[in-house]
Amino acid sequence: MPNAIVAAEQYREIFLNQHPIMDVRAPIEFTRGAFPNSTNLPLMLDSEREKVGTCYKQSGQQAAIALGHSLVNGPIKQQRIEAWTSYVKANPNAYLYCFRGGLRSQLTQQWLKEAGVEVPYIQGGYKAMRQYLIGVIEAAPIQQPLLSLSGMTGCGKTDFLLQRKEAVDLEGIANHRGSSFGKNIDPQPTQINFENQLAIALLQHQTSGVACLLLEDESFLIGRSALPQTFYNAMQAANVLVLEESDDARLERLRNEYVHKMYSGFCERLGPEAGFAAFSDYLLQSLVSIRKRLGGKQHQELQDLMQQALDQQINQNDTSLHLVWINLLLHKYYDPMYLYQLDKKSERVLFKGSHQAMHEWLDSYQTR
């Protein structure tokens, strides 16, 4: 029976259906970049892979293969086969891959076959699948018209996007809310993983049958996640929708996001005392990150107000003073910057309105 190979034509189906994949690359390769539906069960550990790589450079392929067999042998080999078979037992429809769909994939498949387990390996491996996803991102602006959702900080763009089937949530994929205070408790994905997850989200969106692709009007960087250049350029040329919200609602939303949610998250992760310390550091360091743009005097004023709010919060369990520095930050920093940016794209604005009005406009857009 010939070895079972999953052809490149099936990449789309693998990603859309979140097909379970056994990634037999070394842990260091997996950490740099992987797919959401993959599990790292390496043929060789990092140190073993490094030795084999050095041997390959010095003595050629056959010597490297022989060294690999000597390093992964006996009980070590048996442990790896047992880990693979356990995964396949839990995921009977699993596929496997290595970096290029070469020797590591073939050897893993052979050892599994000898253990009585048949697992297809993916043609081209991780590298070819990654290239496929890069192509998905580059082609996305051609597949559907783009609409860019803009609006002042705190107007609820993310909340709005999460209610729309036309939307892909870039900030959710980047695990960052896009502003200077947009850091979340959990770290952002690696750049490669951000791109992989973005491509899969775009693939899923393209099967949803909607008339457009709705994205938040983002900077090139979302935290430290960089939008692919071609995709970002298309976003910069897209027509714009402007979401409007009252100042009071914006203040309350930002207090909830910057203060209540972050404080609760840190305390849940670290406990009350360490949680409050980490929360305070998050706020103060976020302010430091925009010190140059604020200017020293304005930064000091905001820092003093922020510290007063933190003191009131810890001593009186009252977060009302946070509204003072948030209000100043909006009107002295975020709003002027937003209005300047909006003025440059005013000719591309299709519609401005409240959450309800925007929902109605988009509903009618779908039927045009």
UniProtKB/Swiss-Prot annotation:
Family, similarity comment: Belongs to the SelU family.
Protein's job: Involved in the post-transcriptional modification of the uridine at the wobble position (U34) of tRNA(Lys), tRNA(Glu) and tRNA(Gln). Catalyzes the conversion of 2-thiouridine (S2U-RNA) to 2-selenouridine (Se2U-RNA). Acts in a two-step process involving geranylation of 2-thiouridine (S2U) to S-geranyl-2-thiouridine (geS2U) and subsequent selenation of the latter derivative to 2-selenouridine (Se2U) in the tRNA chain.
Gene Ontology terms: biological process: tRNA wobble uridine modification
PANTHER family: TRNA 2-SELENOURIDINE SYNTHASE (PTHR30401:SF0)
Record-linked Gene3D superfamilies: Rhodanese-like domain (3.40.250.10)
Assembly notes: Monomer.
Enzyme Commission number(s): 2.9.1.3
Catalytic reactions of this protein: 5-methylaminomethyl-2-thiouridine(34) in tRNA + selenophosphate + (2E)-geranyl diphosphate + H2O + H(+) = 5-methylaminomethyl-2-selenouridine(34) in tRNA + (2E)-thiogeraniol + phosphate + diphosphate; 5-methylaminomethyl-2-thiouridine(34) in tRNA + (2E)-geranyl diphosphate = 5-methylaminomethyl-S-(2E)-geranyl-thiouridine(34) in tRNA + diphosphate; 5-methylaminomethyl-S-(2E)-geranyl-thiouridine(34) in tRNA + selenophosphate + H(+) = 5-methylaminomethyl-2-(Se-phospho)selenouridine(34) in tRNA + (2E)-thiogeraniol; 5-methylaminomethyl-2-(Se-phospho)selenouridine(34) in tRNA + H2O = 5-methylaminomethyl-2-selenouridine(34) in tRNA + phosphate
SMART domains tied to this protein: RHOD (SM00450)
This protein's record includes keyword Lipid metabolism: no
One term of GO molecular function: transferase activity, transferring alkyl or aryl (other than methyl) groups
Keywords: Selenium, Transferase
Organism expressing this protein natively: Shewanella baltica (strain OS185)
Protein name: tRNA 2-selenouridine synthase
Active site: 98
Rhodanese domain: residues covered: 15-138
One Pfam family recorded for the sequence: Rhodanese
